[in-house]
Amino acid sequence: MKIHEYQGKELLKQFGVPVPRGIPAFSVEEAVAAAEKLGGPVWVVKAQIHAGGRGKGGGVKLARSLDEVRQLASQILGMQLVTHQTGAQGQKVNRLYIEDGADIQKEYYVSLVTDRGTQKVALIASSEGGMDIEEVAHSTPEKIITEYIDPIVGLTDAQAKKVADAIGMPADSTAQAVDVFKKLYQCYMDTDASLVEINPLNRDSKGNIIALDAKFNFDSNALFRHPEIVAYRDLDEEDPAEIEASKFDLAYIQLDGNIGCLVNGAGLAMATMDTIKLFGGEPANFLDVGGGATAEKVTEAFKIMLKNKGVKAILVNIFGGIMRCDVIAEGVISACKAVNLSVPLVVRMKGTNEELGKKMLAESGLPIISADTMAEAATKVVAAAK
């Protein structure tokens, strides 16, 4: 689960991380009132969407008068903000954050993320913070510093100072940087976050350290422990199809291709998508029905997939371990009838009750294309989608 920048800064503030004063706004008038309350003389008008790259996309602007705040708020609020993370369709801006302007002397980058390979938390930092951090990581990876934290021990002062020194933090700000790093780590652990990113972490002309941005992702499996974080959820920022899928315990992510995929198991789903790509196709979605899918669940999965009008063919790829192939077959038949399926459907089933499932499909009277291998299934569905 993601949250907005201003919500992330509320969390950071709770853990003692310095952030600028700011007020969220949901209308132009609220934006002007927020600027008046903050006092100025310089404000930052920030679009609030669940995506990075807002600055380059035109969603973060400086204002030096209340009239300019009004003008910029009118421009940004309601705009379809396109960034490298939103895709070409962009994301509508429904909220703004009006913030005190900052004295920017030097911008750093810092983040915390779980490294599954080492089973530790990685503290990642760079002296090159700001809008071009992705380019820095690509072109000069030596400027990205990584320190692995043992979750049993936690982030030590020595580790935090090592990172501060490695990114060239001046001596008069090192103690502050160490304090901020440790508080960020505490925030990361206590909130069950999967990502905390500050870009930029600013050092002003007086040597003070302050977080000018805040990006959070949270482990959805741990949200039951954090109702206060669930309260931050903004459904307007989420794909309606993904919200609908979650109601039926379906893992669904829409993509840009034209071949719908219905698979049981995340690993098989990714392998299926890779195979479709290998044979020249483009998957329209990731959809994992899980190990305990019912006929109703499969029907709902079809309905969700077909809400995407770009779907030209569907591939159902099932391995019947816990899942029985006859149950999937029943669901496929039911779904085809319920949605009046009008696009080609390729089905591959292997495992428990495989023969019964295939027999049910063959006797259904529906124009279902059968396949025995993943290569055959991918070949047939790619051809059918053309």
Curated annotation (Swiss-Prot):
UniProt KW Protease keyword: no
Stored Pfam families: ATP-grasp_2 (PF08442), Ligase_CoA (PF00549)
Cofactor note: Binds 1 Mg(2+) ion per subunit.
Enzyme nomenclature, EC number: 6.2.1.5
Binding site for substrate: 264, 321-323
Domain ATP-grasp residue range list: 9-244
GO terms, biological process: succinyl-CoA metabolic process; tricarboxylic acid cycle
InterPro entries associated with the record: ATP-grasp, ATP-grasp_succ-CoA_synth-type, ATP_grasp_subdomain_1, Succ-CoA_synthase_bsu_CS, SUCC_ACL_C, Succ_CoA_ligase-like_bsu, Succinyl-CoA_synth-like
UniProt xrefs under Gene3D superfamilies: ATP-grasp fold, A domain (3.30.1490.20), ATP-grasp fold, B domain (3.30.470.20), Succinyl-CoA synthetase domains (3.40.50.261)
The protein's assembly and partners: Heterotetramer of two alpha and two beta subunits.
Designated name of the protein: Succinate--CoA ligase [ADP-forming] subunit beta
Encoding gene (name): sucC
